[in-house]
Amino acid sequence: MEAYEIHKGAQVPPRKARMNLDLVRGKDVKTAQGILANTNTKASRLISKVLNSAVANAVNNNGAKESDLVISECYINPGVTRKKIRFGSRSNVDRHDKRTSHITIKVSDNVKEAK
């Protein structure tokens, strides 16, 4: 059985979030939670929340055991980019892009489904 969770519009750039997601790809849930807890970044905190929600979905909806769950698939897609302006000296204006991400994590209790 498989359960997933999607967090859309996370306030973290996709490039920075992918570095943390690569650490836990294909690992079991307990190991992944330990790795994310010891990684001190905003992206790891958001990924940890999405992982905990995916595990809760698997336990509640499918009746799976938390100890058997493995991260079968996880990816980050770019979200909406907010464009903000910042005023500088001598009537100069610079544009700053605030990038967002869509974080998707799928957990499975079958080891064969995990890639």
Language-model features: locations:
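Ribosome large-subunit tunnel/peptidyl-transferase-proximal elements
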Residues: 1-76, 98-115
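Short, flexible micro-motifs
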Residues: 29, 66, 82, 91-94
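A short, conserved strand-capping beta-turn/loop at the end of a beta strand
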Residues: 76-88
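C-terminal structural segments of small proteins and small subunits
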Residues: 85, 91-102
